[in-house]
Regions:
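A glycine-rich (often HGG/GG-containing) alpha/beta subdomain
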Residues: 1-146
Length: 148
């Protein structure tokens, strides 16, 4: 199971940050980071649920945020996937990433790994994956249009 910050954050942070998790242990990760209190998440796929995020080792509150659950195969990667929408301060982001990295069988994704998993699971074809890369890297209006 992998995780990564999906939001491009400036050094000063932002209002909101999104962290994605994908893989077989995604529900375990949700349970750990919410201390088993992600009420209704399984019954409400693709709907935002407000949750407290805690460090499972200390029970310390990290943040309050929205959790979205996308069960396989109807997710970007074709795997179980969730998004944690948190406040975008660097302190909150760094704590969440640190805690996720300490959960068993959960590791930081390599660059492009979410898209590679989508490609391998038949959710995208190669041209679409290249288009996503080009769109992410687009700096001009012309580059944005070509990527789409």
């Amino acid at each position: 199971t992998i995780f990564a910050l999906s939001t491009n954050i400036k050094s000063s942070g932002s209002a909101i940050a999104v962290i994605r998790v994908s893989g077989d242990k995604t529900l375990n990760v949700i349970d750990e980071i919410t201390n088993g209190k992600a009420d209704g998440i399984r019954e409400k796929p693709r709907q935002a649920c407000l949750n407290d995020y805690v460090d499972p080792k200390t029970n310390e509150l990290i943040d309050k945020g929205m959790t979205l659950w996308f069960p396989r195969p109807k997710s970007y990667t074709g795997e179980d996937l969730c998004e944690f929408h948190i406040h975008g301060s660097m302190a909150v982001i760094n704590k969440m990433l640190s805690v996720l990295g300490n959960i068993n069988d959960c590791r930081l994704a390599r660059e492009g790994e979410f898209t590679r998993r989508a490609l391998m699971n038949g959710k995208l074809h190669l041209i679409q994956a290249e288009g996503i890369r080009d769109l992410i890297n687009a700096r001009t209006e012309n580059q944005r249009r070509r990527a789409l």
